[in-house]
Amino acid sequence: MYSLLRPLLFRLDAEKAHSLTLSLLHYLPGFYFRKMAGQPVHAMGLVFPHQVGLAAGLDKNGEHLDALAKLGFSFIELGTVTPKGQTGNPKPRLFRIAEANAIINRMGFNNSGVDVLVENVKSANYKGILGINIGKNKETNLNQAADDYLYCFRKVYDHASYVTINISSPNTPDLRQLQQGDYFAELLAQLQKEQIKLADQYGRHVPLVVKVSPDETDETLKQMTDIILQYGIEGIIATNTTCSREMVKNLPCSEEQGGLSGRPLMELSTRCLRLLKQYVGNDVTLIGVGGIDSLESAKDKINAGASLLQVYSGLVYKGPELIHDIVSGLNAV
């Protein structure tokens, strides 16, 4: 069905097509949806039905949680959400590079605020594994950034299976500086301290996950993993989008500012994943994302060290059948 809809959707502005597709999910007939039977994965104290989940960014406010759940994901990650709602960057801010199965976005953490997301999650019927991705508001300076993350962490704790700290988006000014040295260590120290309090308050432990950039040096990644191990962070998502344009040079829209995702990100993000595996071994769960649009690319992520996978851009180009193709293919291995 998606193969019939895609040419029509691709005639629309990318952000309008994105919104329309999410709306249409609510009206698809029941036979279109399926439950995937895969190989369970035990990670971060959770049992994932299979390896393929949805990356953050598709449903920022949790408005489409039940509809997305019917596509067969093992887990769904919502967000990025910030303490206060914000409009994000001016439009247009989402661009397809169809020739390369790629997307450039400079959305800028547009969302309705953490309170709206929590209410949407509470009203949904979804009972599966739920990640919630948290960030800081644009106007919050770096010295106060930890306050934004702590605020969101407290708000979402009782509604999340795990919480992702997004400090790697290229579309919020200076955000990636939070991956550096003292900023990073102080942020994780405060979140770990709060995690202990919240676990006692709610009677359950919710793992923290860090989403990293593919554009950092090997040395920076090593420093980050040392801090991640020091503070008992249980997962790393590798990776966010890249600022590099080497893989799409001279293609339409390639000069647009923002983060590049999709097939051209595959090699860079997988290299990062492989390095992270060397640095953390089996002490931290690695979630591979970036360029997965086939069974082959999914296998490459797993071979590089990923225990779990997330898709987003591949879903835009291949449709929900991508989930089935990967899960059934991995089952056959």
From Swiss-Prot:
One of its GO terms (biological process) is 'de novo' pyrimidine nucleobase biosynthetic process. InterPro entries: Aldolase_TIM, DHO_dehydrogenase, Dihydroorotate_DH_1_2, Dihydroorotate_DH_2, Dihydroorotate_DH_cat, Dihydroorotate_DH_CS. Its cofactor is FMN. FMN binds at residues 56-60, 80, 133, 166, 211, 239, 262, 291, 312-313. GO terms for molecular function: dihydroorotate dehydrogenase (quinone) activity. Coiled coil: none annotated. Belongs to the dihydroorotate dehydrogenase family. Type 2 subfamily. Monomer. Catalyzes the conversion of dihydroorotate to orotate with quinone as electron acceptor. This is Dihydroorotate dehydrogenase (quinone). It comes from Legionella pneumophila (strain Lens). The gene is pyrD.
